[in-house]
């Protein structure tokens, strides 16, 4: 990736950390009675495609944002749940859908709609579509208490990271205002004086553990993989020092994916990270390969904690469709100047997988080179033994020639 292209995402990420708007208050009412109140500032980090590759954009919730009345509701008991929809700009929508049980309520789902035809935020975008992304959230509180979170709340969607700041949210209000009692988010945690700070992750962790992945679609399995993954990330810390750290992908992370005619995706995620691997296919040569990597991640000690990178022009882990790619040697896949993906002990097969088993193996060049080393050493030793044997026979013949027969 060219240097200007690498600097632009970093600059946008820095701007994302600085673009903190003031908190705004939003209310949903029914016949003049308030049922939902929410106060927060928000930003939306996403990527989009241009002719020059992926771009990152950070959109702040403007002061002009308002409640969309025909998209918000107090809900009806046993019929529908309350929802808050905020509208701004050219077709942007943020929706919070609430639900409750006997003791707690929560934001069960969050939706964000954005418009790629908006040239102010998406200049030179190839697509002009309107997209809606969604995710579940960890926003929950006790009934008759307000949910309070001073820290950033990050909600990771497929191609969007929503960040809420300085948030107070309450649904199912019993009065027309926030309750004095509050349920605090886990991010705020205890006071820092109650214990020592958490240590930073090690610069170089141990090698990752091999994980098994399986992606199934309507026509059966489209991806079978066994591999250990490690992220090598370079970022700017809060003290303005640049550091490179390695993060292992755990077998305990949640995996999912999708099967398409020309694209197979594998998504591996936990509460702080979403990694997506995209496999493409060259139909003319009947080859599959890793063509794209997308990462959204939280880095707590970074100057800009939200880290988002993608590259869709890769060509790695390549093999014939119907066969599996295998490599025992560690591979380093360059994604950008800020991210590389390290792959260990990989065997992967995409698009065509019969009976949920790997097909014929196509080994990587690196493994072939590694096999040459013991062969060369063995050949050298055999040659040395042969030379010693020849020298011995020549020496023995000469010693016999030195005596005369009586």
From Swiss-Prot:
Residue ranges of the region described as Hinge: 189-218
Region (Second lumenal domain): 219-370
Post-translational modification as stated in the protein's UniProt record: O- and N-glycosylated; some of the N-glycans attached to LAMP-1 are polylactosaminoglycans.
Keywords on record: Cell membrane, Disulfide bond, Endosome, Glycoprotein, Lysosome, Membrane, Signal, Transmembrane, Transmembrane helix
Compositionally biased region (Pro residues): 193-205
Complex and partners: Interacts with ABCB9; this interaction strongly stabilizes ABCB9 and protects ABCB9 against lysosomal degradation. Interacts with FURIN. Interacts with TMEM175; inhibiting the proton channel activity of TMEM175.
Family: Belongs to the LAMP family.
Protein name, entry field: Lysosome-associated membrane glycoprotein 1
Annotated organism of origin: Mus musculus (Mouse)
Lineage: Eukaryota, Metazoa, Chordata, Craniata, Vertebrata
Gene (UniProt): Lamp1
């Amino acid at each position: 990736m060219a240097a200007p292209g690498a600097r632009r995402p970093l600059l946008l990420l820095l701007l994302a950390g600085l673009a903190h708007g003031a908190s705004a208050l939003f209310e949903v009412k029914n016949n003049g009675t308030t049922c939902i109140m929410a106060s927060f500032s928000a930003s939306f980090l996403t990527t989009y495609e241009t002719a020059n590759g992926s771009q990152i954009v950070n959109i702040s919730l403007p002061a002009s944002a308002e409640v969309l009345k025909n998209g918000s509701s107090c809900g009806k008991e046993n019929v529908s749940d309350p929802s808050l929809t905020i509208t701004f700009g050219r077709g942007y929508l943020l929706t919070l859908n609430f639900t409750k049980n006997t003791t707690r309520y929560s934001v069960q789902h969050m939706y964000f709609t954005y418009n790629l035809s908006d040239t102010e935020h998406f200049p030179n975008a190839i697509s002009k579509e309107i997209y809606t992304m969604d995710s579940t959230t960890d926003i929950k509180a006790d009934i008759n208490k307000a949910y309070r979170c001073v820290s950033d709340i990050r909600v990771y969607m497929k191609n969007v990271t929503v960040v809420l700041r300085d948030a107070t949210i309450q649904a199912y209000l019993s009065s027309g205002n926030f309750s004095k009692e509050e349920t605090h988010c886990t991010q705020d945690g205890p006071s820092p004086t109650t214990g020592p700070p958490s240590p930073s992750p090690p610069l170089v962790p141990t090698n990752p553990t091999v994980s098994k992945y399986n992606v199934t679609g309507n026509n059966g399995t489209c991806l079978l993989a066994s591999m250990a993954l490690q992220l090598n990330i370079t970022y700017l810390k809060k003290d303005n020092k640049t550091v490179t750290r390695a993060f292992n992908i755990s077998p305990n992370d949640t995996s999912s994916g999708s099967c398409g005619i020309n694209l197979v995706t594998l998504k591996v995620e936990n509460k702080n990270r979403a990694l997506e691997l995209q496999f493409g296919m060259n139909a003319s040569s009947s080859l599959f390969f890793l063509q794209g990597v997308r990462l959204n991640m939280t880095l707590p000690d970074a100057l800009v904690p939200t880290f988002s990178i993608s590259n869709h022009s890769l060509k790695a882990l390549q093999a014939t469709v119907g066969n599996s790619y295998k490599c025992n040697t560690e591979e380093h896949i360059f994604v950008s100047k800020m991210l590389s993906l390290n792959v260990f002990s990989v065997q992967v097969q995409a698009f065509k997988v019969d009976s949920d088993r790997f097909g014929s193996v196509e080994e990587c060049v690196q493994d072939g080179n590694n096999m040459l080393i013991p062969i060369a050493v063995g050949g050298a030793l055999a040659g040395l033994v042969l030379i010693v044997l020849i020298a011995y026979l020549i020496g023995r013949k000469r010693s016999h020639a030195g005596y005369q027969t009586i």
